[in-house]
């Protein structure tokens, strides 16, 4: 899907694919990718072996470029590391660093809102490699579409889209879903 949209430098990682492109590609990826839950835009890379280093590195980011005092934010963390045992703790330390950055610089802080924040921030740690990203998708991409209410699906929509892509089906013939009730 990403290649068809014009993405460059594709690299497959653990539960993710990274790519490069311009802002137009970012919008296209959010609109067209059926096999993605989120499209993240990396803003800072660093190495860390403990939560204190994460805090110090996150605090180095010029957060006013991405977040203002009147906006809300939430942190999502994904951890694949023996050095970090608890993803929520990493999320809390990331949040603390952002809040402390604003307090030290502006004497005020933006609010945290877990549900429907203005800005989703993701921290991904693989071993000691850390990436801070802005979530360009907002709500999970599987929730886009015309349906007002979502019900439990027997198969994750993103997984189903990936399976169909692997079959090579291009929509030129009928598609029969034997699992459909």
What does each of the following model-derived ranges do?
Residues 63-65, 111, 120-122, 165-166, ...:
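A generic local secondary-structure boundary/capping motif
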Residues 132-166:
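SAM-dependent Rossmann-like transferase core, predominantly class I methyltransferases
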């Amino acid at each position: 899907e990403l290649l068809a949209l014009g993405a460059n430098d594709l690299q497959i990682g653990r539960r993710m694919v990274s790519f490069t492109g311009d802002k137009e590609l970012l919008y296209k990826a959010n609109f067209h990718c059926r096999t993605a839950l989120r499209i993240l835009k990396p803003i800072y890379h660093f190495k860390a072996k403990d939560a204190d280093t994460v805090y110090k590195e996150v605090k180095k980011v010029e957060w006013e470029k991405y977040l203002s005092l009147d906006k809300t934010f939430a942190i999502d963390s994904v951890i694949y590391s023996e050095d970090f045992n608890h993803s929520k703790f990493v999320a809390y330390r990331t949040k603390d660093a952002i809040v402390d950055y604003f307090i030290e610089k502006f004497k005020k802080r933006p609010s945290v809102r877990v549900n429907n924040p203005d800005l989703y921030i993701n921290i991904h740690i693989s071993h000691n490699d850390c990436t801070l990203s802005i979530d360009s998708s907002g709500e999970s991409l599987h929730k886009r579409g015309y349906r007002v209410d979502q019900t439990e699906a027997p198969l994750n929509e993103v997984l189903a889209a990936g399976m169909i892509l692997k079959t090579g089906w291009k929509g030129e013939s009928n598609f029969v879903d034997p699992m459909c009730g």
